């Protein structure tokens, strides 16, 4: 499982097991453009069939989820597109009440049918579906209420619904190819363009239900090489990057660059 990566100017830091180093370049307070280095190119922007962390880094800005981790240090799941939720006494039914002010980037309002569609599509995903495998069925009881049914109680279920992006059912059904290459979400940034092997460009969603982002233009530059990425930070070509420990001394020597060590969550395993 990979949680939303910390972009201090965009979102909050998630914590737990492994340390990672990030470098940021000092910027003018009124700067409205941000360039972030990616370690590798993406293969898709499909909301459920992605398989890499860099894809999720981009998708996190385009889409939102029902719930998210509270960044106050406790990291408890809290509502996002969902306004509130209840859990039945037997732990088998989770009822989510949706906000009424969430719109997709094309102007369509998010409905319970979109949420049902998104959870069902996510569960079918070869790459992501295991995160909500405990979900037996899901239904919309009205336009703003979704009920998830489990066969057996599963206490971490709320953590499971932190990951599925909420997608527009009508957009997917209209053009599944565009769904994977020209995504339409509800997040703080809208997809603009992609140059394969080079960059992905996003622009601020001025109608974002949580408030328009201060950063208006967000670009992800594909820079796999560690040394090249370090040079790009020093020249100001990029403003934010995950950096390797081998280049830390040269970056720390630059007063315009700030290094932050943060905690991130993940699973590591050995295949036998």
Predicted regions and their residues:
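Short, well-ordered beta-strand elements
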Residues: 31-40, 83, 93-96, 115-118, ...
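Sec-dependent signal peptide cleavage junction
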Residues: 20-30
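Ligand-site clamp/hinge motif
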Residues: 205-251, 265
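Gly/Pro-rich hinge or "lid" segments in bacterial periplasmic/extracellular proteins
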Residues: 70-72, 162-213, 217
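Ligand-binding "clamshell"
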Residues: 132, 250-261
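Surface-exposed binding/hinge segments that line
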Residues: 90, 130-171
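N-terminal lobe/hinge region of extracytoplasmic solute-binding protein
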Residues: 37-89, 120, 184
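Aromatic- and charge-enriched surface segment that lines or borders ligand/interaction sites
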Residues: 83-126, 141, 147
